[in-house]
């Protein structure tokens, strides 16, 4: 990803650094409107996901995570910005006339050809079952359930590694550091997701953050006692308790949120690294 640095003409552009991406020109048959409401609230209006709200209107781009066009070659026509994810997307024109969006693989350029199916070349952007891949292959957009489409390693710069194959299962090392088993018949895409330098962007001003639908983050220690357990006191007072707490009084650090009995516990060989 190419980083574009602004000249220092105004305070808001003094430290701005954004990616010089191809402008978005979505196809009408691949987009539809979505009703965004709630602003991080649940059905009762209580905040369940903080610091969300506002933002520019978005059109959802329908992404092909299944890669159902088997053994039909396609050509990358455009590389576009997608407001619904931090990874870029690219438009594919297939030989049978179909046009679909997929996640942009790192290093892919306009004019490259891709294909999905069994016994296809181990090439960046191609999708094939794990059983046909050699060990050590870097992959993304990995299926968990056969035929459901890719669900793992879809964020910008995400990449997993195929480290073993035994019996009916394949062992993968995920971007989080977790090592788990997945059926060898599940499909994945070769390569790494593009837009690797997304974390190097500097928006330069608060207004650009608001356009993304992200609201300001306020520390609890500067609030009033009625708003947060850390609030109150004279001047710069400490939080007044042994351990940090959430706005609702629960422990803020180290609380486990995963269910104790889950079907995938037997498939996880090593937990993710924190």
From Swiss-Prot:
- Supply the Pfam families for this chain: Ribosomal_L2 (PF00181), Ribosomal_L2_C (PF03947)
Any one annotated GO CC term: chloroplast
What keywords were assigned to this record?
Chloroplast, Plastid, Ribonucleoprotein, Ribosomal protein
Q: What GO MF annotations does this protein's record show?
A: rRNA binding; structural constituent of ribosome; transferase activity
Q: Which SUPFAM superfamilies match?
A: Nucleic acid-binding proteins, Translation proteins SH3-like domain
Q: Write out the annotated subcellular location.
A: Plastid, Chloroplast
Report the superkingdom from the record. Answer: Eukaryota
According to the record, the residues making up region (Disordered) are: 1-22, 223-274
Gene Ontology biological process: mitochondrial translation
Per the record, the similarity remark reads: Belongs to the universal ribosomal protein uL2 family.
Assembly behavior = Part of the 50S ribosomal subunit.
* Name this protein carries in UniProt: Large ribosomal subunit protein uL2cz/uL2cy
Q: Which organism is it from?
A: Phaseolus vulgaris
């Amino acid at each position: 990803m190419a980083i574009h640095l602004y000249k220092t003409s105004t305070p808001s552009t003094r430290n701005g650094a954004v990616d010089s991406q191809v402008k978005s020109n979505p196809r009408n048959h691949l987009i539809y409107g979505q009703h965004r409401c709630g602003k991080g609230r649940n059905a009762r209006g209580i905040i369940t996901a903080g610091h969300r709200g506002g933002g520019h209107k978005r059109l959802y781009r329908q992404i092909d995570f299944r890669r159902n066009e088997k053994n039909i070659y396609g050509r990358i026509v455009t590389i576009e910005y997608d407001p619904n994810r931090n990874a870029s997307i690219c438009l594919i024109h297939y030989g049978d006339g179909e046009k679909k969006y997929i996640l942009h693989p790192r290093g892919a350029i306009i004019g490259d050809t891709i294909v999905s199916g069994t016994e296809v070349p181990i090439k960046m952007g191609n999708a094939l079952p794990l059983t046909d891949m050699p060990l050590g292959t870097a992959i993304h957009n990995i299926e968990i359930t056969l035929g459901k489409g890719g669900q793992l390693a879809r964020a910008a710069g995400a990449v997993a590694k195929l480290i073993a194959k035994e019996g009916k299962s394949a062992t993968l090392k995920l971007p989080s550091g977790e090592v788990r088993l997945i059926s060898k018949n599940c499909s994945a895409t070769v390569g790494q997701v593009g837009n690797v330098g997304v974390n190097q962007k500097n928006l330069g001003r608060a207004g650009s953050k608001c356009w993304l639908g992200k609201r300001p983050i306020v520390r609890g220690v500067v609030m009033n006692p009625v708003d947060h357990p850390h609030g109150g006191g004279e001047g710069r007072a400490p939080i007044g308790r042994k351990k940090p707490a959430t706005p609702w009084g629960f422990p803020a650090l180290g609380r486990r949120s995963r269910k104790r009995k889950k079907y995938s516990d037997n498939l996880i060989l090593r937990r993710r690294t924190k």
